Curated annotation (Swiss-Prot):
The lineage of its organism: Bacteria, Bacillati, Bacillota, Bacilli, Bacillales. It comes from the Bacteria. Belongs to the cycloisomerase 2 family. PANTHER family: 6-PHOSPHOGLUCONOLACTONASE, 6-PHOSPHOGLUCONOLACTONASE-RELATED. It comes from Staphylococcus aureus (strain MSSA476). One of its GO terms (cellular component) is cytosol. InterPro entries: Cycloisomerase_2, Lactonase_7-beta_prop, N2O_reductase_N, WD40/YVTN_repeat-like_dom_sf. This is Uncharacterized protein SAS1845.
Length: 342
């Protein structure tokens, strides 16, 4: 049995953090329950036996740390709610486990926290930095919108996507906070959202929410150079849709991207050691607004959360040879679910 967690909005019926048990032998979820009620816990991160979740209380915003026990149940360690500048949308941890990074979409800012490397607790907010870059012409790009922050494969920087400014910004970082390093621009109105790095550290898959495209980019010393791009929806689809999550299979052979509105998952074959992508197929996600999904460590199953409609959680069996997925379970619900982790 594999334990997993789903983060959610708490605007309507969402509970914050759900816990589920994935039965990999039967390709289904045997249990899905409220794991911990945490307001606005829209993104989660697991670091061994500690889980971090976006959180807010009133006007105070930040991140909470929780201990995962032997049964997969969650227990609060502490919270660091040191800002009034808005709730985050992404969290990640540095390789040395000393720092936690947070991206805040609404305010267009990034945050950096100090961590206790022994307990995983959050010690303090080190810095909150606002983006101030020229924005695109799309109506959603009225100001900068930091959407992702994570350490680069070389370990030297953090890379931040800005959906409002159509770019990736890299920063040096230390005990004092962030220092601007380089920026890589993409097309106007792309709405650059997330990055998934290939294990070789040379190539990155950059997804753009507004243009519904994925770019293959070569990464080198804080800079991203686009090599090619692919549409993640059918060319003849003219409905309202927005790209959401991106994940690589653990064997690095296939890339998966979810589309909210078209309600699908696009599957690409990874070619030439990560340098190229080739569309395999686009499969219905089995629900409405597939905000996030994740792939079990065995590479056999994919679990997808749907933010809208019935908020069904779908489980797909995955063919390791073709990359294709087949729906096998849609009996569980996680209201307002927007993040899936194992």
């Amino acid at each position: 049995m594999t334990n997993g967690y789903i983060g959610s909005y708490t605007k309507k019926n969402g509970k914050g953090i759900y816990r589920f048990e994935l039965n990999e032998n039967q390709s289904r979820i045997d249990l899905l329950e409220t794991g911990f009620e945490l307001e606005a816990s829209t993104y989660l991160l697991r670091n061994n036996e500690v889980l971090y979740g976006i959180n807010k209380e009133g006007e105070q915003c930040g991140v909470a740390s929780l201990k995962i026990d032997d049964n997969g149940e969650l227990h609060l360690l502490n919270k660091c709610l040191s800002s009034k500048a808005g709730t985050g949308c992404y969290v990640s941890i540095s390789e040395d486990k000393r720092y936690l990074f947070e991206a805040v979409y609404g305010a267009g800012i990034i945050r950096m926290y100090e961590l206790n490397t022994h307990t995983g607790e959050i010690i303090r907010l080190i810095q909150e930095l606002a983006h101030d870059f020229p924005t695109g012409t799309h109506e959603r790009q009225d100001h900068p919108h930091a959407h992702y922050i994570n350490q680069t494969p070389d370990g030297k920087y953090v890379a931040v996507t800005d959906l409002g400014a159509d770019r990736i910004v890299t920063y040096k970082f230390d005990d004092n906070g962030f220092e601007f390093y380089k920026e890589s621009l993409f097309k106007d109105s792309d709405g650059t959202r997330h990055i998934e790095f290939h294990d070789n550290g040379k190539f990155a898959y950059v997804v753009h929410e507004l243009s519904n495209t994925v770019s293959v980019a070569e990464y080198n010393d804080g800079k991203f150079e686009e090599l090619e791009r692919h549409l993640t929806i059918p060319e003849n689809f003219d409905g309202d849709t927005k790209l959401a999550a991106v994940r690589l299979s653990h064997d690095q052979q296939f890339l998966y991207v979810s589309n909210r509105g078209h309600d699908s998952i696009a599957i690409f074959k990874v070619l030439d050691n990560g340098q190229h992508l080739e569309l395999v197929t686009i499969t219905e996600s089995g629900g409405q607004f597939p905000r996030d999904f994740n792939i079990a460590s065995s590479d056999d199953l994919l679990v997808c959360a749907h933010e809208q409609g019935d908020s069904v959680v779908t489980v797909f069996e995955r063919n390791k040879e073709t990359g294709k997925i087949t729906l096998c379970d849609n009996t569980r619900v996680a209201s307002e679910g927007v993040c899936v982790i194992f």
